[in-house]
Amino acid sequence: RDLVRSRGLGDVYKRQKKYTRLADAFTPLAKGINSEYANQTAYDSISIHGGSGFIMEYKCQRLYRDARIFSIYEGTTQLQVVAAVRYITNGTYLSIMKEMLEGELSCDCMKGLRERVAKLVQLYEEAVEKVNASENQDIHDFLARRLYNMTADIIGSLLLIEDASKAPELFKKSAHVFVRMAEEEVIGHTAYIKAFNPEDLEQFKAVEEETEEA
């Protein structure tokens, strides 16, 4: 650090530290969600051929296998959730969202859509606070995937809105469709998390613990 200061590289060091932190936070988020989207898209492409016979005739069956291998090669989604959850609970993603909401848009046509996403950020913050308030690690683990999906939905929406403000002819429709999907998922997950209590975990256990006979 002394060498950095002596050469006047303080700003470079700060930027490097910032982007290293962002890369650490976004890598598990991007890997997990992209593999899930790839799987869903490939699965949907197979579904449209339903009833036509031998699926091996279509390239989509190969793409579906590739998508499955991709998700395993990059680490299963659950492993990516484990890697990302600390950035959820410590507020890293929330800070990024709020910073993105304050950024300038190239086109006013996206302001209304961003206001809708701002409401989702509020719900997300409430959901994170609810989970953080619990000292039960099982609850943290159980609800982590929903928080992970909410994180990806909101950040994906904000990135798409930013692109749409620069090139509305290319991304405006996609932004509206994606935000609508994000609203459905974030609102639903928030309701689920807020209503969840520690005793609810018992309902999800496959095998009940054997009670000792008196």
Describe every region a protein language model picked out.
Residues D2, A23, R146:
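Generic anion/oxyanion-binding catalytic loop in active/binding sites
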Residues D2-Y13:
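Single conserved hydrophobic/aromatic residue that forms the stacking wall/gate
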